[in-house]
Curated annotation (Swiss-Prot):
Record carries keyword rRNA-binding: yes
Function (record text): With S4 and S5 plays an important role in translational accuracy.
GO molecular function list: rRNA binding; structural constituent of ribosome; tRNA binding
Name of this chain's protein: Small ribosomal subunit protein uS12
Protein family membership: Belongs to the universal ribosomal protein uS12 family.
Modified residues (3-methylthioaspartic acid): 89
Transmembrane annotation, as ranges: none
Phylogenetic lineage: Bacteria, Bacillati, Cyanobacteriota, Cyanophyceae, Synechococcales
A GO CC annotation given for this chain: small ribosomal subunit
SUPFAM superfamilies referenced in this protein's UniProt entry, alphabetically: Nucleic acid-binding proteins
Keywords from the named record: Methylation, Ribonucleoprotein, Ribosomal protein, RNA-binding, rRNA-binding, tRNA-binding
GO-annotated biological processes: translation
Length: 124
């Protein structure tokens, strides 16, 4: 605990928080181009083939992003929109691709949580 004299000499240092999504550069979303689309296996207790893409962003970063939902139409050179949000069981994946924008199609036949997957309202 500093004394009053010490505080007069120099003020308290502000704590700087480290961002969890540095590639977005304080923007809510970023556009990018897929350089590689592939599957990755999750960490120890889980087992799956998670769909991920390597994306070169307009901010100059190249990051790994998760493709949510069942089925996708992404391939190399697809233009995508990225948001923050990590995938807990995939190390190094700190971004999500937004479905239903730019070259990314929405999830087909999605009935619930449609807005999160870019799915249109069902016809019936």
């Amino acid at each position: 605990m500093p004394t009053i004299s010490q505080l007069i000499g120099s003020e308290r240092k502000r704590l700087t928080r480290k961002t969890k999504s540095p590639a977005l550069k304080s923007c809510p979303e970023r556009r990018g181009v897929c350089t590689r689309v592939y599957t990755s296996t999750p960490k120890k207790p889980n087992s799956a083939l998670r769909k991920v893409a390597r994306v070169r962003l307009t901010s100059g970063f190249e990051v790994t992003a998760y493709i949510p939902g069942i089925g996708h139409n992404l391939q190399e050179h697809s233009v995508v929109l990225l948001r923050g949000g990590r995938v807990k069981d995939l190390p190094g994946v700190r971004y999500h691709i937004i479905r239903g924008t730019l070259d990314t199609a929405g999830v087909k036949d999605r009935r619930q949580s449609r807005s999160k997957y870019g799915a249109k309202a069902p016809k019936d």
